[in-house]
A protein has these predicted regions:
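Conserved GHKL (Bergerat-fold) ATPase module
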Residues: 1-187
Length: 187
């Protein structure tokens, strides 16, 4: 009952109710409320959201994670997603299967070798903002598991025990630097 009266602060410092936050971007993402827990640290994502005209709310207190889980349980069709969890279709352009497969294979090999991380997940997408060369996304499920582990004092545990870190390196196929690396994998 009280969820109708709870106010969320959005990226423009406006306060919205739960229903208003859902309604705000209904055309762009049905039944999804995007949020940030640190607008400064996630400023690249915040700027991308603003550029695409997509709103997000700010949830930076410890009580927010259990609260949004409770809201998701009470409203089964509603999902809260942190802005760095994944790039939805509003931020990307279509890419052909052949081009995607070729670029992903080449760039995955190059970055795994350069970063010396065999377990690195690499994803290639055409992000609309050509200035962005790469981003790290963390799946919502993995991030929530990590938050829960921190809350219960288990932060020293390895997230790989629960199916990996959920981190993905997203490379922008529209970026000049990524195009250069693709054309010159040896440098």
């Amino acid at each position: 009952k009280m969820s109708d009266y709870v106010l969320f602060k959005n990226l423009d410092n406006k306060y919205l109710t739960f229903k208003e936050a859902l309604e705000e971007n209904k055309e762009k993402h049905e039944n999804t409320i995007f949020y940030t827990n640190d607008p400064v640290q996630q400023s690249q994502y915040v700027n991308m959201f603003k550029d695409q005209g997509i709103d997000a709310i700010i949830l930076k207190d410890n009580i927010d994670q259990p609260f949004i889980s409770q809201l998701e349980q009470k409203n089964e069709n509603v999902k809260f997603v942190r802005i760095d969890a994944d790039l939805n279709d509003s931020f990307t352009e279509e890419i052909s299967e052949d081009e995607l497969k070729d670029a992903t294979e080449k760039l995955t090999e190059t970055f795994k070798k350069a970063l010396n991380r065999d377990q690195l997940d690499v994803k290639v997408q055409k992000i609309k903002d050509e200035k962005v060369s790469s981003m790290i996304t963390v799946s919502e499920e993995s991030r929530r598991m990590q938050d829960m582990m921190k809350m219960y004092g288990m932060s020293g545990m390895d997230p790989a025990m629960f199916g990996g870190s959920g981190e993905t390196l997203v490379l922008n196929a529209n970026n000049a630097l990524v195009k250069y690396i693709l054309a010159n994998p040896e440098g």
